Amino acid sequence: MVENIKSNITNIMKENQGESSLSKIVPSIIKKGIDNVNLDMFDDTTRNNLLNAAGDEYVKRGDFVQAVKSFLLTKNIEKLNEIGDIYSSRGQFNQAVEVYSLSYNFSQDKNKLIHCGEKCILEGHYSDALRAFSIAKDETRLINLGEICLEKEKIDVAIEVFAVLNNTEKLIKLGDKCLNENRLGYAARAYEIANNKDKLSSLGDVLLKSGLLGSALRIYELANNEMMVKFIRENFSEDQLGKFYA
């Protein structure tokens, strides 16, 4: 029994010595920065402990960029998600989605991304919701987001949603709507992503009639309408071609 006690005491002392050594090294890591420190001389366990300890210290200091770098090197999913939660609670959804996506690369667990995406919708951050659902490959939520964006007149995001979904029918329908409402930039974007040459040429005709020659030329080029491209280039000056839609 006495020998067992001695053995336990020895193990505890070794553990404390190890922790003491780590605590002495961590400040040096913090000072140099994760990108500039070399920990190759340590075994994997010690190296990971050092990096995790450094990551915790960075979090305390509010330096989440360095903290993320630390936890990425140790593939510490839990700690990465904690940082994502901090960003999300502050309304910094761009950063939250980025960190959750890094965690997702290791875990393949979509829950954090989906929860963040839904929170983004509630708070009107539709582009961030698009990123979250796209990374999670959640088609159902992307479809719903597209409809919400149409309802809220967030046309730019709606176009990108339908682009991710590769829904050419929705893109063309939305492009037609934008064309009818004289929102020509959005119409051009929708038709271009849908890769519909006929619609692009029709838009080019509208732009030409409106005197927006620079935009008309660009759209005809996208439509591979060589006849109209040649017509514009041979009949109008460079100054005239400087007119674009807003």
State the predicted function of each range.
Residues 1-246:
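Long, low-complexity, acidic Ser/Pro- and Gly-enriched intrinsically disordered regions
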